[in-house]
Swiss-Prot record:
Cellular component aspect of the GO annotation: nucleus
Protein's organism: Drosophila melanogaster (Fruit fly)
InterPro entries for this protein: ZFTRAF1, Znf_RING, Znf_RING/FYVE/PHD, Znf_TRAF
Family: Belongs to the ZFTRAF1 family.
Cell membrane found in the keyword field: no
Protein name as it appears in the record: Zinc finger TRAF-type-containing protein 1 homolog
Gene Ontology molecular function: any one: zinc ion binding
Biological classification of the source: Eukaryota, Metazoa, Ecdysozoa, Arthropoda, Hexapoda
Keywords: Metal-binding, Zinc, Zinc-finger
UniProt-listed Gene3D superfamilies: Zinc/RING finger domain, C3HC4 (zinc finger) (3.30.40.10)
Zinc finger (TRAF-type): 171-227
Region (Disordered): 1-85
Length: 412
């Protein structure tokens, strides 16, 4: 963050023609005549103006011809004067920093989405009247209109919106990408467009594993401590027998991933596959203790109406008192079905989302009596401390959670 500051220039003594008018009892210092100045470098002249005695200021004729106090200030000395100047600079820098933050905040408010009040992370659309909507909210409004069998409208001015009438606002997208955003690891600010690269490859505080983690080292810490740890790591000195357990656990994880991907390949061969780009918004229960939960609007899939619901720490009474945080979600059938429906589903990052989530496929058979799946863990990547709490906190800090839901219907 650059701070522009201007140092106050030392003013030159006014010429005799620009001297201010004096009262009867005021005195002004004047220089001696040219002849007396040349004869003595340290002489001072005295004159009387309005009856007052005036003492001349000695000049440094061997140097720059400036008064000593002024010469000392120009040379960088001055003791108290320098301290005062430094304090003034710090005050100016602090004031400029505060103005910069306020300006960034005002610009953020002007460029935010009219629906979720968040800055755009992908494309930004506008209605015919110029009201802004991020891509996620824009598609959400269009989907709501389709479900209600109504024409979608702008939430601000109620003008009709559609893919043909709304247009992208590239200027807003460009401006939003330049706004400062805070790194979740080092808390420094970077332009939003370069934040992801910084967090993944440049940040010295980003969580990193030891390069010997495959043979059992469980260390995980900031990147700048990696070299020191690896120099002192004891795992390279262990025997093959000692690291066999870690290698077997690593092989088991590889087998599980291979099994999951094989399952996904089989699911992609199904006849009925559908995906929806959804947005979960926060709500509170009506209980005495209002618990937080997230829920999407209704969406259509396989000629049925569905909802996705999520909760934090399995609806723990006081989740704010826990350092470990998880998100679990369930798929709910909102319409009646006469035949059982065997559904495979999983959540993943969508085109309007910056959510970091691993792939985990779940299955539930929906019937007339079983319209809600169990709550399944939303697998978030490990952060600081080896858990997904940091990613969970980042998602909870947003106005909503955008994601894509893939669903596969098994024909029987």
């Amino acid at each position: 963050m650059s701070v522009e500051s201007s140092s106050s220039a030392v003013q030159q003594p006014p010429s005799s023609s620009n001297l201010p008018l004096l009262g009867d009892n005021q005195a002004v210092a004047t220089t001696s005549s040219a002849s007396s100045a040349s004869s003595s470098s340290t002489s001072s002249s005295s004159s009387s103006v309005g009856g007052g005695n005036v003492v001349g200021v000695p000049l440094d004729t061997q140097g720059s011809g400036e008064p000593p106090a002024k010469k000392q200030l120009l040379d960088g000395g001055g003791g108290g004067a320098t301290s005062s100047s430094g304090s003034s600079l710090l005050s100016s820098a602090a004031a400029a920093s505060g103005m910069h933050e306020k300006l960034a905040h005002r610009i953020s408010n002007a460029l935010c989405c009219a629906v979720c009040l968040d800055l755009p992370k992908t494309a930004m659309y506008q209605c015919q009247m110029g009201h802004l909507m991020c891509a996620a909210c824009f598609t959400h409004l269009l989907a709501d209109g389709r479900l209600r069998d109504q024409i979608a409208t702008c939430p601000n001015c109620r003008v009709e919106i559609s893919k043909s009438t709304a247009s992208r606002n590239l200027a807003v997208e460009k401006a939003a990408s330049e706004l400062p955003s805070e790194c979740q690891f080092c808390n420094k600010e970077f332009p939003y467009k370069s934040l992801e690269r910084h967090e993944q490859h440049e940040c010295q505080e980003r969580p990193t594993k030891c390069k010997y983690h495959r043979i059992g080292c469980q260390w995980r810490g900031p990147y700048h401590e990696t070299n020191e740890h690896e120099r002192n790591c004891l795992h390279p000195q262990k025997s093959g027998y000692e690291v066999m357990a870690a290698l077997e656990a690593h092989d088991d994880r590889i087998k599980e991933e291979k099994k999951m991907f094989n399952t996904l390949i089989d699911l992609l061969s199904y006849e009925k596959i559908i995906f929806n780009d959804l947005q979960m918004k926060p709500y509170r229960t009506d209980e005495y203790v209002h618990k937080l939960f997230y829920e999407t609007a209704r969406f259509s899939a396989f000629n049925q109406q569905w909802v996705v619901k999520a909760r934090i720490n399995n609806s723990q009474r006081d989740p704010h008192q826990s350092n470990e945080r998880t998100i679990t979600y369930q798929l709910i059938l909102k319409t009646k079905t006469s035949t059982p429906m065997s559904i495979h589903f999983f959540a993943l990052k969508g085109p309007f989302s910056d959510m970091k989530v691993s792939t985990q496929i779940y299955k539930h058979e929906f019937t007339e009596t079983s319209t809600e799946s169990e709550y399944y863990v939303l697998p978030l990547p490990d952060g600081v401390g080896g858990s997904g709490s940091s990613e969970c906190n980042r998602m909870l800090a947003n106005k909503g959670i955008n994601f894509r839901l893939l669903m596969f219907l098994l024909n029987k």
